Design a protein with these regions (language model features):
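Short acidic, low-complexity intrinsically disordered linear motifs used
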Residues: 218-234
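Extended extracellular/luminal ectodomain segments enriched in beta-structured repeat modules
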Residues: 66-72, 86-88
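Bacterial N-terminal signal peptides that target proteins for export
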Residues: 1-9
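Bacterial N-terminal signal peptides
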Residues: 8-18
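Extracellular/luminal beta-rich ligand-recognition
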Residues: 25-26, 30-53, 83-162
Length: 234
């Protein structure tokens, strides 16, 4: 009986060690235009193809990952994100840091018109990447506090390649609002793209919740799922 028990323990440990090599967390994300480090992170929002003749400004999917000090975000379009086509594109990441729809700025309406989103959020911040003719426009890339319209940061990492764009911004770059981001706290995220390729029609995504600093469950070759955080020793 003792031998069987020990063999069982060894099998479990073997499975755990196999999974550990594949575990992914936000600390492993490098902003380099190679998106393989996002593959194990689940999709937060899937968005339908609904922008006629504007695949480059039409969101397909969003992913979010956070560590204890950094917010990372991946945006995927149906076409080429930020293309060299001579048109202007503005991609926005919305952050509802207190996860309360009745605080911050709602995405239920925009410039007096309903957005038709089914799960609106009340955003305190957005992060914008603005592109014109494939070049970064002066002053168009920034993190903004929506209620005061205060620009908090223009110096954060981002990279585009093909259909995807990734960015990372440390919580400290939110200045006096940095304390709003706490490990274990649930936030909501969404996105919208506004550009001239489709007569300035806006593509709004639905929202998703995200726990700051959360560990992702990883499944590898039908082995036991495990949280990366559980593998770490204090």
């Amino acid at each position: 009986m003792g031998i069987r028990f020990m063999l069982l323990i060894l099998c479990v440990l073997s499975a755990v060690l196999s999974i550990q090599a594949f575990a992914v967390e936000a600390d492993d994300i490098v902003i380099d235009g190679n998106f393989k480090d996002w593959e194990k992170i689940p999709v937060s929002v899937e968005d339908p193809e609904d922008q006629a003749n504007n695949p480059n400004g039409d969101y397909k999917a969003l992913k979010v990952a956070t560590s204890d000090d950094t917010f990372c975000f991946l945006q995927v379009a149906y076409g080429e994100i930020t293309p060299l086509d001579g048109k202007r594109y503005y991609y926005h990441v919305l952050i509802d840091v207190d996860n309360k729809v009745n605080t911050g700025i709602s995405n239920k309406e925009y410039e007096g018109k309903p957005t038709k989103v089914k799960r609106p959020i009340g955003s305190e911040f957005y992060i914008q990447i603005g592109r014109d003719k494939g070049q970064v426009e002066f002053g168009s890339n920034y993190a903004l506090h929506l209620e005061t319209e205060e620009i908090l940061s223009k110096d954060f990492e981002w990279k585009n390649n093909g259909d995807s764009l990734e960015l990372a911004i440390p919580f400290k770059d939110f200045g006096k609002y940095a304390g709003s981001f706490k490990v274990g706290q649930t936030i909501s995220i969404a996105a919208f793209q506004e550009g001239e390729a489709n007569g300035w029609a806006i593509d709004w995504t639905e929202s998703a919740e995200h726990e700051i600093g959360q560990a992702y469950v990883v499944q590898v070759q039908d082995k036991l799922p495990l949280l990366w955080a559980e593998l770490k020793t204090p």
